[in-house]
Amino acid sequence: MIFVVKKILDFLVFIFTKEKLLLYSKQTKKIDCLIISHLINTNHLIEKNDFYFGSLQSRLSTYKLSSLIALRNFTGKNLRTLSKLPFDKKHYKVVLSSFFKINVEIKIILLFLNEFFRIKILKNKYDKNFSLLKKIGKIKYLKSIFSNIRISEQVIFLIKLHKPKYLFFTYEGHAWERIVIKKVKEFFPKIIIIAYQFSIVTKYHHSMFRPLNKIYNPDIIMTSGSITADLFKRKKLDKTSKILIYGSDKFTSKAHYNLPEKSILILPEGFCNETNILFNFCILASTYLPDFKFYFRLHPLIKKNDFIKKNCIQKIPDNLIISNNTLEKDFENSKYAIYRGSATIIEAVNFGLIPIYYSQKNEISFNPLFKFEKKPFKIQNIKDLNNTLKINFKHEKLRKIRGYCRSFFQQPNSGIIKSLFKKK
């Protein structure tokens, strides 16, 4: 129960330091649209476009619709620290605190304890060796109760404060999304709930495509392209939610075919273990292939200084570079892209790079391009990589994979936004 004690102590510190509940870029009252997004890097505070929703706020303002983006704070910094940083002043933004009102936090702790002991009793009553109960009874699987309940309470609080007619949020299949949908439908049934599927799907993606009782399903699902729109329809989700192809600001209009020959971009996800897997492989590859340049691009969730300290960067080969470039510049510098579960591979392929999926033995695939998961686009070791790099890839060989990626992130369609608000 150390985790619960730590949570209580953190909350007491939060109270006594009089930490803010909300941090606004600029104050606003009544709005048309509330957008729930995520702050994963402090640099994103000054960006005009949101990291997940892109230019949605600007597109809404084109139709004279006011909006507020509420950012869940994953930077590791409190609101007092963030308040000293520059904000984009063009759009309304609010950063949510990692804690909320006292009564809410007490309720969450009680819910957590109730669930923890309920599962303990079930384990003792039925079967101590029942693997599912053993798993979900572990603290690490119950920790999400705190953030899931808190975000639902914060959303309800913001709705009461700003009285929006529409609620947008990112849609990946997380539990908090369904909890928010249910609460909003219960307390504010007239609000139109719009879930935005913005990222990749894998072969084993399930929760996002799982149709539940109507009260847990969004009114509208906006997708990044026709690939996922078709998946939602195939899973019969169009019976409970309207499916619309909105597109994505990650869309690239033109592929580039004259990229540097001996250059490879590495695209890890925003998890430390995944970053380390690709970094270790990259060290081996750059040592074995000294004629190639390797550009290792950290995900915004990974703090570069911390990563450098932990990985003794001074010992890496000279042809391995930890990139500080913009994403587009990294694309321009590279012909190939090695990845695992990163959504950025879709953008890389659309730009003109050749995708190479690095798979470890006996693991479940989480390849966003799983339909093309075979050699030469899939490797498991340096020998495989070397063989792939020797291939003269012609346009015809890449045509299908590029067509798939172009249908995954399509050009944003403002007409979809216009049609939504016309009907209200």
Give, region by region, the residue ranges found by the protein language model.
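Catalytic-core helical/loop segments in enzymes performing group transfer/polymerization on anionic/lipid-linked
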Residues: 1-424
